[in-house]
A protein has these predicted regions:
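Binuclear metal-dependent phosphoesterase catalytic core
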Residues: 201-209
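A glycine-rich helix N-cap at a beta->alpha junction
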Residues: 50, 54-68
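Short internal beta-strands
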Residues: 34-42, 173-175
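Active-site metal-binding loops of divalent metal-dependent hydrolases
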Residues: 11, 42, 117-119, 139-141, ...
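Active-site metal-binding motif and surrounding structural segment of the metallo-beta-lactamase
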Residues: 1-36, 66
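Metal-dependent catalytic neighborhoods of phosphoester/phosphodiester hydrolases
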Residues: 18-25, 182-190
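Metal-dependent phosphodiesterase/nuclease catalytic metal-binding core
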Residues: 68-174, 183-194
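General small-molecule cofactor/ligand-binding pocket signal
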Residues: 38, 63-68, 84-86, 199-201
Length: 209
């Protein structure tokens, strides 16, 4: 829907280290178009480090756009799509992203989806995500572990489903499971009791937007 961009969610190793491999692959395959990367301010220093030590021979520029907001903020707009960032509730600075297509004469309907990674339950999300077609929302724990979820700034199955229900989204995708989750049928049923149109994603799954 738009030229490749990278949207960084937060500054932690599991969200960050794969970026170096992505940049190296783009350079190896001769990318020339600028690459726009959005994320927390601190990510700029990491990208400068990469360019200093591994950027020789790169044919494309990395254009870093810092994200810092307390409510939804438009971070990218093209003829096809608007992308907004919004703050999540985690132990460190963390953002989600919403994508809204721009209607055209041939495609007058608006298609939208949103991605909420690491976050505790946050009531404002249902307002910010109102009406999206597809919502990905982390659901690290089953609801019996709501206290642990709150302590670790993550969400439960029921909380993710409540967000989807209150936001009146079309479909909910949950993932980011704790290693404690062994009964995926019970896990998914907890979500479906609140929001029936829900699927629990597995590695390698592909979803049509």
């Amino acid at each position: 829907i738009f030229e490749p961009h990278d949207l960084s969610l937060r500054m932690s190793s599991d969200h960050l280290f794969g970026l170096f491999g992505l940049l190296s692959s783009m350079a190896m395959y001769g990318r020339e178009a600028d690459l726009y990367i959005y994320g927390p301010q601190a990510l700029g220093s990491v990208l400068n480090f990469y360019r200093s030590f591994f950027g020789e021979g790169m044919k494309f520029d990395i254009v870093f756009k810092a994200v810092s907001c307390k409510e939804p903020m438009l971070v990218h707009s093209s003829r096809n799509v608007n992308v907004s960032a919004f703050p999540l509730d985690h132990k460190i600075e963390c953002y989600g992203y919403r994508f809204d297509s721009i209607p055209t004469a041939r495609r007058p309907e608006i298609t939208s989806y949103a991605y909420c990674s690491d976050t505790a339950y946050k009531e404002q999300l249902s307002e910010w995500l109102k009406g999206v077609n597809v919502l990905y929302h982390e659901a690290t724990y089953q609801h019996e572990m709501a206290d642990k979820a709150a302590f670790r700034h993550h969400s439960t199955t029921v909380q993710a489903a409540q967000c989807a229900r209150d936001a009146e989204v079309g479909r909910l995708i949950v993932a980011h499971y704790s290693s404690r989750i062994t009964d995926f049928e019970a896990y998914l049923n907890e979500c479906k009791e609140v929001f029936p149109n829900c699927v629990a994603a597995q590695d390698g799954d592909v979803f049509e937007i």
